[in-house]
Structure formats: C-alpha cells, structure tokens
Amino acid sequence: MNPKIIVLNPEKCTKCYDCINICKEIHGESRVRKVDGIPIFCMQCENAPCKEICPVDAIYLKDGIPIVDKERCIACGMCAIACPIGAIFIKNRVAHKCTLCLDVDRITPACVEACKDKALLLVSEETLDMMKEEKRKKILKILREEAKENL
C-alpha cells in the first residue's frame, strides 16, 4: 500500500512550525491544524467521515485520499463536525484539509520535506499499525516493571 498518513513524533517536534509555514506558502492557507501548539494532520481515513457526511458530495477520493471539490462545497461545516481529529475546517466559505500535496503534484508532502527535525514521517496504514504495536509493547513493558517495583 502507498504511504498516505503523516505521523508526527512529538518527541522530535520543536514546534518550529516549518510544516505549517510551507503548507501556507504552497496552498495559500495552511491545512495543518495546530492544537495546543502541536501540528495535527488529516489521517486520510479509509471510510472518511468528512466524505460520507457531505450533503453535496463535494469530497471525493483521489488515490484513496479525500479531496475537497471547492466548486461544489457549500461550506455547511458538516465535514468539520464529522472529522474525529479536527483536521478539516471551513475558511473563506470552503472546506480545507490536507491532501498530502496531491493537488500540487508533489510526490512527498511539502511539510514532511520541510521538517528539519525529521519529526514527520509519511507512512502506510500497515507501518502505522506496526508503530502503534511497538509503542504499545514499550508502554506495557514499562508498566510491568513499575508494577514489580511496587510489589
């Protein structure tokens, strides 16, 4: 499967916001959201709630990535409400979301290339699942060690 999810390593992120700045430079509006100072990226959901809820079918899939058709969008905001992480938003009467720079014909998203701290990775769903499992095992090991110490 092609890489299609941007993952942020918060331990490497220095909050320089180069990812946000390059996105704004390329697209005119940064599609990277910032929550409590942390960049938030669209997860490019397989069964995207934003696409499913759109009453005018303004969100379509291109190479498995949800894309907003700005001509069809009526800025009702249903997509923004449906997004589980708040990655899609309405501004200037149209919905905006990360497209992994597909709309500007880039192979690698500009934000990933701009991140000098290498805090951003473009990964496949399978790789993300493996990363989650590794993290889960690491946390479980720490918890077991702490439990032994407290006995």
From Swiss-Prot:
Keywords linked to the UniProt accession: 4Fe-4S, Electron transport, Iron, Iron-sulfur, Metal-binding, Repeat, Transport
Protein residues bound to [4Fe-4S] cluster 1: 13, 16, 19, 115
Binding-site residues, [4Fe-4S] cluster 3: 42, 45, 50, 83
Keyword rRNA-binding appears in the UniProt entry: no
SUPFAM superfamilies: 4Fe-4S ferredoxins
Residues the record lists as binding [4Fe-4S] cluster 4: 54, 73, 76, 79
Cofactor(s) listed in the protein's UniProt record: [4Fe-4S] cluster
Residue positions binding [4Fe-4S] cluster 2: 23, 98, 101, 111
Comment on bound cofactor: Binds 4 [4Fe-4S] clusters.
Disulfide bond positions: none
Name the UniProt record assigns to this protein: Uncharacterized ferredoxin MJ0155
UniProt cross-references to Pfam families, sorted A to Z: Fer4_11 (PF13247)
4Fe-4S ferredoxin-type domain boundaries: 4-32, 33-63, 64-93
Superkingdom, natural source: Archaea
Any one Gene Ontology molecular-function term assigned to this protein's record: metal ion binding
The species this protein was found in: Methanocaldococcus jannaschii (strain ATCC 43067 / DSM 2661 / JAL-1 / JCM 10045 / NBRC 100440)
